[in-house]
């Protein structure tokens, strides 16, 4: 079965809806958006697999414009504790080559979940600069032994 969603509020709608019954947005008005813009909007989709897929594709595109929307989505996700989505966002940020993602990834080394800290470390390992190396060294003092070990492996590589 195929489900259709309003591209504004992500409420489920009927296939032939012209206006969203919930938010009153005109559905056709979103047709002009670029693929990139639609992916960014999908980071807020009500269905978690769509959010994860959007983060993954944004990472694969390696478009630096995605850093801010990904970071914003990560901040929103932190409140609902969707570790799989958060991890997908961290991995996507690591695939985007550019200094824009670096501060976000460094901040994630203080995330409460060792899974997210590990994903941030792996993403930071792609950056070959002083800031990233200093952040990875800081992870040697992480409370999680697995994070400490990962940091050692990255620094030895």
Regions found by a protein language model. Name each.
Residues 54, 86-89, 120, 151:
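Conserved hydrophobic register position within alpha-solenoid helical repeats
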Residues 46-47, 77-82, 112-113, 143-144:
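Short inter-helical turns and helix N-cap capping residues of alpha-solenoid HEAT/ARM repeat scaffolds
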Residues 13, 27:
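Cys/His-rich microdomains that often coordinate metals
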Residues 2-3, 31-42, 63-77, 98-110, ...:
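Amphipathic alpha-helical scaffolding segments comprising HEAT/armadillo-like alpha-solenoid repeats
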Residues 6-9, 20-23:
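Short cysteine-rich clusters marking metal-coordination/redox-active sites
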């Amino acid at each position: 079965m195929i489900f259709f969603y309003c591209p504004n509020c992500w409420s489920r709608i009927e296939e032939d809806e012209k206006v969203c019954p919930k938010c009153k947005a005109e559905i056709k008005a979103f047709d002009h958006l670029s693929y990139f813009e639609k992916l960014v909007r999908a980071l807020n989709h009500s269905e978690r697999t769509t959010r994860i897929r959007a983060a993954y594709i944004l990472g694969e595109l390696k478009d630096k414009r995605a850093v801010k929307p990904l970071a914003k989505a990560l901040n929103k996700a932190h409140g609902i504790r969707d570790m799989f989505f958060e991890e997908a966002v961290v991995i996507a940020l690591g695939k985007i080559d550019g200094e824009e993602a670096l501060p976000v990834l460094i901040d994630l080394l203080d995330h409460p979940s060792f899974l997210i800290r590990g994903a941030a470390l792996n993403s930071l390992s792609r950056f070959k600069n002083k800031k990233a190396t200093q952040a990875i060294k800081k992870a040697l003092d992480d409370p999680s032994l697995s994070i400490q070990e990962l940091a050692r492996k990255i620094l030895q590589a």
